[in-house]
């Protein structure tokens, strides 16, 4: 290597004053020359990694005292492999040990302060000697360099011997987790992200979705304050932690949030006060049909409690799925407060970003929004009517908004309270009439705008404001002279259905992009968990075959290089981009070389990510093999 090539190495942070030139015949010089085309150029003052300064240790951290070995570890990390390579059980005889050290060649690192036996301090040079031959040592200027012989083989060409399970043991091959490196964020999702926060959102979930999920979680965690809301039973059957979802008052029906000890989920309980069922079989025969109905725009009914005595009366309770921070159409479009959940513990009102108040001042809702409601409600009615049922509760207080989704709630209550002797066709026609009333209320901005006396006054406003298609839908739903079905309004919806579908697909793309980002975060977590599982194991402190030299010493230095960087002033250098970049390069086995320095400053190692990856995979396989041998 010539001096002008830009390579400059010192003897460590503690005793480096002048650069030491490597002789032309040095094996370290040959190693660096052969990899010069693949690695970056390292010059004076230039860090080895583009975004990271060279690790400069400032102190030695004392090693904690040795403790008793933990209970036998259950092999729960079989899925930590980042390759589609079956794990192997390596017997003790095949475990590769650390490289040997001659006289005067020692590693002064934290592992030397373990409470070790004298036999472990002086390791026999002949122990697994064939496994150490791939390491080359060269001392220049008081610094010991470790490197491997230059080779043309790829990082994954190293061969491992397939081990056979001994008697009494079972060898289990698992496919592991596939290595994936998808570009983040997804290219076609860039138009859904603001430019100001584009860089921050490439690695983390978007703030809007984060706040929405946090608010929903807060709604799940709220508790009831008996001093404010009065006396509420501690439990109702298997439901506990009841919290009212409506303002307390004199009313015949109340709604609660409750936790079920059966499955650990939260449910919405609709209580009918003082209602005793005289003929349970006759009045509840449609409940099972409602339980079987599954549709995205219908809140599913889960359970009905008949003649419940928990409230000191004979109450009828319906249990539905709970959607936190969901608000009704009445709250969203006609009330001053919408989409809020009152927490009696702290007095906060938690508002969902998707449920923003939309006050109406003499005008109706936008036609695009009304068509979105029409399409979703029509889809729900189509599913209900196809099941041989009728909604019977289609009004502004029974339709909830959850995000951008419309859902019909409290279905089945009228079938139990007031069984209708009329035919199902007549009940379904009544659903369509209520559907038309709902559209009129949204279009006119008046909750009772569907009344005949008011509708005649507002009819001119609807004709001047909205399209012919919307007026035709209202006229069709209000027409009682002919028998009609929900399917007949599909031609009136026309191409607007595709607009709603495109918006839903766009929202799905956004959520999938966020999910893929969190999946990448999970991959890096598994990699960190895998590395920390191998390092500094207390139970192997007296095991010569598990001394933290060789592969595990490389991993310890790499951990310091990634997480324990310091600035020139000795302050902690906290850079998430550096951590994510290093872990990704380790995961893919990059050929880029980095310089790692021991905490004492006596040892510097130049190594590529591909070698570090092999060290991690091999050390983890050794740990799995040792664990299986110990717990046969």
Swiss-Prot record:
Keywords: ATP-binding, Coiled coil, Cytoplasm, mRNA processing, Nucleotide-binding
UniProt KW Coiled coil keyword: yes
Role summary: Regulatory subunit of the poly(A)-nuclease (PAN) deadenylation complex, one of two cytoplasmic mRNA deadenylases involved in general and miRNA-mediated mRNA turnover. PAN specifically shortens poly(A) tails of RNA and the activity is stimulated by poly(A)-binding protein (PABP). PAN deadenylation is followed by rapid degradation of the shortened mRNA tails by the CCR4-NOT complex.
Lineage start: Eukaryota, Metazoa, Ecdysozoa, Nematoda, Chromadorea
Name assigned to this protein: PAN2-PAN3 deadenylation complex subunit PAN3
Species annotation: Caenorhabditis elegans
Annotated residues for binding of ATP: 270, 321-328, 397-398
Compartment(s) where it occurs, according to its Swiss-Prot or TrEMBL record: Cytoplasm, P-body
Pfam families assigned: Pan3_PK
UniProt biased composition (Basic residues): 107-116
Region (Knob domain): 534-632
Record-linked SUPFAM superfamilies: Protein kinase-like (PK-like)
Keyword DNA repair: no
């Amino acid at each position: 290597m010539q001096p002008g090539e830009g390579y400059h190495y010192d003897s460590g942070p503690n005793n480096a004053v002048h650069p030491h030139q490597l002789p032309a015949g040095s094996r370290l010089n040959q190693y660096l020359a052969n990899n010069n085309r693949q690695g970056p150029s390292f010059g004076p003052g230039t860090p080895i990694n583009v975004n990271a300064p060279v690790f400069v240790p400032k102190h030695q951290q004392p090693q904690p005292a040795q403790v008793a070995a933990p209970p036998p570890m259950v092999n729960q990390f079989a899925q930590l492999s980042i390759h589609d390579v079956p794990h192997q059980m390596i017997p003790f005889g095949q475990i590769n040990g650390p490289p040997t050290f001659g006289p005067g060649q020692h590693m002064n690192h934290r592992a030397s302060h373990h409470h070790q036996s004298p036999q472990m301090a002086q390791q026999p040079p002949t122990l697994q000697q064939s496994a150490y031959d791939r390491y080359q040592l060269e001392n220049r200027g008081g610094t010991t360099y470790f490197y491997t012989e230059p080779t043309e083989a790829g990082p994954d060409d190293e061969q491992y011997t397939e081990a056979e399970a001994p008697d009494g043991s079972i060898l289990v091959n698992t496919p592991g987790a596939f290595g994936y490196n998808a570009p983040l964020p997804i290219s076609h999702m860039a138009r859904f992200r603001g430019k100001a926060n584009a860089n921050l959102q490439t690695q983390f979930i978007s703030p809007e979705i984060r706040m929405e999920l946090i608010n929903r979680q807060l709604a799940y965690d709220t508790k009831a304050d008996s001093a404010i809301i009065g006396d509420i039973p501690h439990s109702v059957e298997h439901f506990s932690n009841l919290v009212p979802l409506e303002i307390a008052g004199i009313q015949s029906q109340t709604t609660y949030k409750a936790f079920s000890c059966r499955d650990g989920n939260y449910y919405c309980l609709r209580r009918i006060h003082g209602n005793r069922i005289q003929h349970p079989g006759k009045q509840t025969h449609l409940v099972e049909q409602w339980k079987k109905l599954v549709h995205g725009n219908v809140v599913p009914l889960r359970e009905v409690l008949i003649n419940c005595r928990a409230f000191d009366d004979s109450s009828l309770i319906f249990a539905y799925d709970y959607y936190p921070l969901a608000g009704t159409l009445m709250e969203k479009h006609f009330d001053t407060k919408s989409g809020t959940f009152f927490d009696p513990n702290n007095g906060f009102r938690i508002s969902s970003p998707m449920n923003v108040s939309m006050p109406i001042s003499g005008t109706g809702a936008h036609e695009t929004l009304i068509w979105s409601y029409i399409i979703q409600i029509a889809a729900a009615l189509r599913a209900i009517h196809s099941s041989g049922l009728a909604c019977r509760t289609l009004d502004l207080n029974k339709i909830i908004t959850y995000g951008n989704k419309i859902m019909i709630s409290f279905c089945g209550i009228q079938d139990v309270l007031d069984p209708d002797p009329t035919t199902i066709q007549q009940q379904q026609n009544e659903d369509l009439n209520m559907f038309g009333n709902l559209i009129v209320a949204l279009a006119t901005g008046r909750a009772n705008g569907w009344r005949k006396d008011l509708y005649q006054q507002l009819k001119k406003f609807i004709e001047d404001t909205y399209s012919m298609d919307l007026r035709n839908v209202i006229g069709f739903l209000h027409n009682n002279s002919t028998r009609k079905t929900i399917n007949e309004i599909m031609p009136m919806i026309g191409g607007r259905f595709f607009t709603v579908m495109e918006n839903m697909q766009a929202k799905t793309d956004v959520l999938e992009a966020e999910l893929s980002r969190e999946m990448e975060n999970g991959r890096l977590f598994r990699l960190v968990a895998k590395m920390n599982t191998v390092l500094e194991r207390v139970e192997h402190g007296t095991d010569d075959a598990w001394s933290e030299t060789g592969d595990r010493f490389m991993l310890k230095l790499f951990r310091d290089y990634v997480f324990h960087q310091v600035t020139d002033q000795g302050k902690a250098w906290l850079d998430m981009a550096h951590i994510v970049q290093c872990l990704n390069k380790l995961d893919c086995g990059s050929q880029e070389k980095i310089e790692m320095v021991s905490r004492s400053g006596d040892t510097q190692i130049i190594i590529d990510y591909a070698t570090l990856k092999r060290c991690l995979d091999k050390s983890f396989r050794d740990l799995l093999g040792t664990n299986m041998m110990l717990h046969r």
